[in-house]
Amino acid sequence: MIQIGDVVVSLDVFQEKFLCDLGACKGACCIEGDAGAPVELDEVMELEEVLPIIWDELAPEARAVIEEQGVVYTDEEGDLVTSIVNNKDCVFTCYDEKGCCYCAIEKAYRDGKTDFYKPVSCHLYPIRIGDYGPYKAVNYHRWDVCKAAVLLGKKENVAVYQFLKEPLIRKFGEKWYQELEVAVKELKAHDMI
């Protein structure tokens, strides 16, 4: 692990390869698992504000869940997460004509309808952020549904941190990411990665 400011980064983030292959996985990370995506407290209001913009895109089951419990809930581990439908799909998940799932929030962002991209934890996946007092931990999360992304990352030689440059900058800032790149060069120079 290396430390940049108050952020500790696992070496896996530099060593492992990853490049989403949506055509292969069809967005499984949005529909698999036992809880919704982690949400930061300040994102709840943004989720609620974008709701009227994306409401008609959402499945009837998702709208029913949102009407009953809201856009987020506290999971078994005590974390705030996006609401889910039938213990599976994120409520913001939609499907295209090919059966590929996509995020209704991200689609609205790309269509210029909102400034909110999507929860940062979704944007950062397969990185997960842990809070440890004054420190944050950046870890690479391995999941079987992302096997195609690992293969594509190896083929294209794209490390996790490179694939996630934009969301890492969103979370920690441009200066932090530049320091991360300097650290990578140092680690490579000393054959540590």
Predicted segments, located by residue:
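Short loop/turn segments that flank or connect secondary-structure elements
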Residues: 1-193
